[in-house]
């Protein structure tokens, strides 16, 4: 059973996730990796603002201290 945040991230590998960042920014993409600082790597990512896609990236690295939540 996944109890710790990193367990949840491990279970979400290679699946689509939504990542909410400080400043009301969101990214949606396939979680490809993470580290103990919750730095995240998303493939086929889209940056969302107010629910609208504003940018697309083949791969993006998100710094962990900007992450508010990750929704699998």
From Swiss-Prot:
GO terms for molecular function: RNA binding. Residues 4-72 form the Sm domain. The keyword Membrane does not apply. One of its GO terms (cellular component) is ribonucleoprotein complex. Keywords: Ribonucleoprotein. Coiled coil: none annotated. HAMAP family: Lsm_RuxX. Belongs to the snRNP Sm proteins family. PANTHER family: SMALL NUCLEAR RIBONUCLEOPROTEIN (PTHR10553), U6 SNRNA-ASSOCIATED SM-LIKE PROTEIN LSM7 (PTHR10553:SF5). NCBIfam families: PRK00737.1 (NF001963). This is Putative snRNP Sm-like protein. It comes from Methanosarcina mazei (strain ATCC BAA-159 / DSM 3647 / Goe1 / Go1 / JCM 11833 / OCM 88).
């Amino acid at each position: 059973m996944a109890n710790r945040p990193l367990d949840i991230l491990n279970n979400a590998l290679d699946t689509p996730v939504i990542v909410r960042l400080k400043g009301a920014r969101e990214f949606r993409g396939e979680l490809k990796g993470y580290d103990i600082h919750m730095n995240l790597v998303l493939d086929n990512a889209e940056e969302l603002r107010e629910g609208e896609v504003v940018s697309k990236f083949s791969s993006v690295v998100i710094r962990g201290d900007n992450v508010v939540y990750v929704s699998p």
